[in-house]
A protein has these predicted regions:
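N-terminal beta1-alpha1 ligand-phosphate binding loop
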Residues: 1-37, 166, 170
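Hydrophobic/aromatic beta-strand patches that form the interior of the parallel beta-sheet core
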Residues: 4-6, 32-34, 61, 101-103, ...
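Generic recognition of short, well-ordered alpha-helical segments
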Residues: 16-20, 45, 73-77, 156
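Glycine-rich phosphate/pyrophosphate-binding loop and the adjoining helix
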Residues: 22, 26, 131-194
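N-terminal beta-loop-helix "entrance" segment that forms/cooperates
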Residues: 32-55
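Helix-loop-strand module that forms the ligand-binding subsite of alpha/beta enzymes
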Residues: 48-131
């Protein structure tokens, strides 16, 4: 499986978490890392080049900090410009069958992203617009990787999160349907029945 990680951090050099993730992913087999904000500091996106990169990979990872309950501005612009009508949707199926994974860092702690928490909603609820975008372009939206509390994380916690992210995005059973099929097969192989 060929994995593409598009990194949308507007100031990657000052980042602690996303920069550590990039370092880890750049040495991970079958992973291509593209730093989109560094590629397009002027905001002029090379749409054919971006479409070609997407087409050449099976699993598409969108890595970014969580900004105002959404994505950084260039990621929104990138989606608007790259997922063109007739190519990604509206009769176009260039991304059909590919897998979509979000890799997100948040400043707030995990317990703030739930009913009753100070952010009021779960991360799953905040990601609905991206999930629907993934659905529209016929990709399979897989479980996201979310690292909460980046603001207060220690260097050891950040490095651990980088290793966990690499394991997450390269997991061949990240797709819940594949994981379920493997579980059922293992049960059958062991003679277990429910």
């Amino acid at each position: 499986m060929k994995i593409l990680v598009n990194v949308f951090h507007p100031d990657l050099e000052k980042s602690t978490v996303n920069k550590a993730w990039v370092r880890q992913l750049e040495k991970t087999a079958n992973v291509t890392v593209r730093k989109i904000c560094q590629r397009y500091p002027d905001g002029k996106i090379d749409v054919p080049a971006e479409q070609e990169a997407l087409s050449a990979h099976d699993r598409l990872v969108f890595q970014h900090p969580f900004y105002w309950y959404s994505v950084p501005p260039l990621m929104k612009q990138w989606i608007d410009e790259v997922f063109t009508y007739g190519w990604a949707y509206g009769g176009g199926d260039a991304l059909a069958g590919k897998e979509w994974v979000c890799a997100i860092s948040t400043g707030g702690p995990a317990d703030s992203y739930q009913a009753g928490g100070y952010n009021s909603y779960s991360m799953s609820e905040f990601l609905k617009p991206l999930q629907q975008t993934a659905n529209l372009v016929q990709t399979k939206f897989l479980p996201p990787f979310v690292f909460h509390g980046a603001v207060h994380a220690t260097e050891a916690e950040i490095e651990q999160s980088a290793r966990e992210l690499a394991a997450h995005i390269t997991d061949p059973l990240l797709d819940p349907q594949k994981k379920l099929a493997a579980l059922v097969q293992a049960m059958n192989d062991e003679g277990v029945s429910l």
